[in-house]
Amino acid sequence: MLLGIDEAGRGCLAGALFVAGVACANHLAQEFVAQGLKESKQLSRAKRFSWAQKIQAHKDIQSVVVAKSAEEIDSKGLSVCLQEAIKEIVLGLPQVLSVCIDGNTLFKLHFPHLKSFQAVIKGDDKIPQIAMASVLAKAHKDQEMIELDKLYPAYGFATNCGYGTHTHVVALAKHGYSPAHRYSFKLKSTYRWTRLKPEHRY
């Protein structure tokens, strides 16, 4: 059994960071791929929701999703939040002895009980369990931003999913922060780098 870990929302200006872990046998993960599962960016939102439901409902698949709020990201930093989430996932599935993380770093994390702990560049394209984790994390991020869009409709969260699109940046310039935004994140405008002020709330 292999545990794949991936995240969604790392580069967003608003909302939580979601880190997901999916553990299952390789043959089962390959079956999902054969049925059309791909890494999250290659799937529509509707298909991500559908696959996430199938992953979480399957009796032979173990999954964990950890959310780190915008407040936690502002107070601890994104890297610390990501490391904490990875620890929570790995330690929450102690029977799993092989772990692959999407990316190029293990963040100097060490788990003595693991037989294998690897960072895989473009792992969501190469390791089915990481692809499954990417879908699960992104589906949770999508759902969060749909809900936040209802609370703060001026920012277009349901469409931009919290990323710094042009329309999102324009809305920030007009309305300032909402309580859902990460106050510590910088924005790259057309003309300059600027840091939003925490007191500029919706």
Where are these regions (language model features)?
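RNase H-like, Mg2+-dependent phosphodiesterase core
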Residues: 1-202
